[in-house]
């Protein structure tokens, strides 16, 4: 590898400060265009599903190429062979990272959630920037470890929370910091509707199926305990319905819908979480799946001039309450409409937003938005045109990206605290926000860490 290039790009990780400000601090440069910097060479771990989508978003920027790619499902690699013929192809990413060391400037991790942590730990050996799919990991302890390793090794990182690069994110923060709406009181967020994507029949877990042709099932399982293949896991991504691989609707979407509110209000970790399910979800009977009509209640402590704050999450078949300020002539049925979004109730007004990055942010009803528009605060925080180009330019310019693990990890952990509450329906779990341990139900702490194989724990347990 060319030494100058190595020093210019890959060596840039050493120039990144260890501390990264939560809630979207300004970066050194915001997507400078027209630069003549070297293209970033990506080592791609996972090329199907979101991997296919995000890698194409990287390529469309014109700032990168794929130098090598690994996927455990052979058909996922066909497009790479055709569109990036220079890329070396692998099934096992560990072999790829080792054999191609020095031939890539950044790593993308777009695997199922249960493999994020070990893939990052492996990539961290090579001290190159890392882009990782959301949620950042599969458990709280994995997430904390990834944040710590990135911080200690000064690795440039970005989480695929693309909403953080959309204009609604800084806009909501500016609105709330202005004080024009008064103090925030509570948020109500809804997601997924009657979505079978998160509602697989529990009995499928006891009906083993044959893995599809081209899938290396052993490699796909990565660090977790071995089980027979369940139909539908690959290639359509139905693994999110199963607790050993994914985190259901809340784990999948929390960064998109908790992130904007947490950023705008500068929320610390919740100190209590409660889950109830209208359909009588019993985790003892169905320990591998998730509730189909859940409501989560996150309690955040008072901070500064803001009092205690309650964040409500409704998913799948659970209807969110109609906001009192919503236009009376418009229908509001979060299940029938399959909406993803939410509303933030403040002392003076109610704000409504969409599925990612507080998209479509507005005051409700429309008449209030029209009246208050002339009084809205000016822009204060940077806007980003492209989440993927932002990461690549951060690599080129040797600076932090706008959604590092320090930020994306906090959003991930907030959602995962709800995941733990899922296993204790109707019980209020209290948490120590410093130790990140449950203080009133000791058995909940057994769910903080991963259920790895002995081999995985021997290899990567030192990171936890």
Predicted regions and their residues:
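Short, solvent-exposed turn/loop segments enriched in Gly/Ser/Thr/Pro and often Arg
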Residues: 73, 110-115, 136-138, 143, ...
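A contiguous active-site-proximal alpha/beta segment in oxidoreductase catalytic domains
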Residues: 129-131, 137-214
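Contiguous beta-strand/loop segments that form the cofactor/metal-binding neighborhood of enzyme cores
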Residues: 171, 183, 188-194, 198-406, ...
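Conserved acidic residues
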Residues: 67, 105, 185
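N-terminal secretory signal peptides and thylakoid transit peptides that target proteins
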Residues: 1-16
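N-terminal Rossmann-like dinucleotide-binding module
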Residues: 15, 19-84, 163-166, 261
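Beta-loop-alpha module in the N-terminal Rossmann-like domain of NAD(P)-dependent dehydrogenases
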Residues: 48, 87-145
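Non-transmembrane alpha-helical segments in soluble domains
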Residues: 9, 55, 81, 94-97, ...
